[in-house]
Amino acid sequence: MPMSPDPRPGRDGASTKPTVAFAHLGCEKNRVDTEHMLGLLSEAGYGVSSDESVANVVVVNTCSFIQEAREESVRTLVGLAEQGKELIIAGCLAQHFQEELLESLPEAKAIVGTGDYQHIVEVLERVEAGERVNRVSSTPTFVADERLPRHRTTGEAVAYLKVAEGCDYRCAFCIIPHLRGNQRSRPIESIVAEAHQLAAEGVKELILISQITTNYGLDLYGRPRLADLLQALGDVEIPWIRVHYAYPTGLTNEVISAYRDVPNVLPYLDLPLQHSHPDVLRAMNRPWQADVNERLLDQIRSQLPEAVLRTTLIVGFPGETQEQFEHLAGFLERQQFDHVGVFTFSPEQGTAAAELPNPVDADIALARKDRLMTLQQPISAAANARWVGRTVDALIEQHNPETGAMIGRCARFAPEVDGEVHIAPRADGLQAAPGTMIPVQITGSDIYDLRAEIVGAASMVASARSAL
């Protein structure tokens, strides 16, 4: 978590209360929850830090999405316990296992559920008074808005904005609805207000997230209103607005038109398709998706010729035959996605898929994953190569101290999951500061990243001065 290791004082300018350390695990939705807890504690006068050595109490915001994530969360907790830290366990693992964590970890002084992190100050005060606290609602109902304090942990120019919490779908492999409850959308006015706040903080890229962002508004307005939300965000002075987690059946003509017509909405579509074969999708409890996958992708490319397409896939789902896997491999080769993530199936206790017969051998699942990733590499390389020669905006995020090169991203790359743009240093040593956006010309490419050079000295000087 990119936060200063030095204790951050509360808003009164001095840490009159103890410093609390934070460890963040899991997805960007979890990150936003962490940022709200940081903001609440800071406002209450606590110091906050990512350096566990400066604090006796550590809040660990955990992940419980798949077995690997649970194991990482438990390793983190045990490691901190071995250091003698008092633990406040928040997030999905706390929601999932609740009292079991308190019983198995004496160092755990509190557990805080996914719908209860807004009470973190009260929880900490009770811990300081000697209580062991269980603050986990059986059914999460809370959703934060722009009024809840927030201390961002991303770089200055990038922010995630959670437009809804929870999920109404029940995909057979997914534990999230059990951990985060049903969908609760925020009003459009609330989201736009927070977007304006973030713009005032210097944010250049705003990433809209939820469990299924294309379902935004269905619970609140009686129909999905992502298109209306994107239109409203068109008036916010943030140059890049990116949408993550678009369920394919929710990409209506109205939504695709908003991608096309709202100038600051990037034509970047994150589509977690999971599979292509109708029988596998039916077993995943996504039966309607098989009828729309290819038709939808054709429609997107027709209406958004510059669309950048990312998807995630699951291999080794119970009962997946070699023939069904070959169907998926053919789909991947045919559709030529820009970016692809592939996961092997992880059985999650409490999900329908965990009880399905005919599990796929782990070695076979891993081999299928490797084959898809190998198949995708030349596709991604060719997609990147098509950008060579273009002049694009790049958001600078860091400098390479050894070479002087600037490292950033263009619109085709989302943070963390996609590639980077490596911008050659100028002979005069002039650099754009992190958080600034500059025009660059793409000069080279590989499977994952692009290489570029700066376009025009005047723009560089302006960017450098704007950062002073």
From Swiss-Prot:
Q: Which CDD domains match?
A: Radical_SAM
**Organism of provenance:** Synechococcus sp. (strain WH7803)
PANTHER family membership: RIBOSOMAL PROTEIN S12 METHYLTHIOTRANSFERASE RIMO, RIBOSOMAL PROTEIN US12 METHYLTHIOTRANSFERASE RIMO
Top-level enzyme category: transferase
**What Pfam family does this protein match (any one)?**
TRAM_2
Q: Which GO terms describe its cellular component?
A: cytosol
The name of this protein is: Ribosomal protein uS12 methylthiotransferase RimO
Q: Which UniProt keywords apply?
A: 4Fe-4S, Cytoplasm, Iron, Iron-sulfur, Metal-binding, S-adenosyl-L-methionine, Transferase
Cofactor(s), names only, from the UniProt record: [4Fe-4S] cluster
Gene3D superfamilies annotated for this entry? Methylthiotransferase, N-terminal domain (3.40.50.12160), Nucleic acid-binding proteins (2.40.50.140), tm_1862 like domain (3.80.30.20)
- The Radical SAM core domain is annotated at 153-382
- Amino acids binding [4Fe-4S] cluster 2: 167, 171, 174
Query: What are its E.C. numbers?
Result: 2.8.4.4
Q: How is the cofactor bound?
A: Binds 2 [4Fe-4S] clusters. One cluster is coordinated with 3 cysteines and an exchangeable S-adenosyl-L-methionine.
Provide the MTTase N-terminal domain boundaries. Answer: 18-129
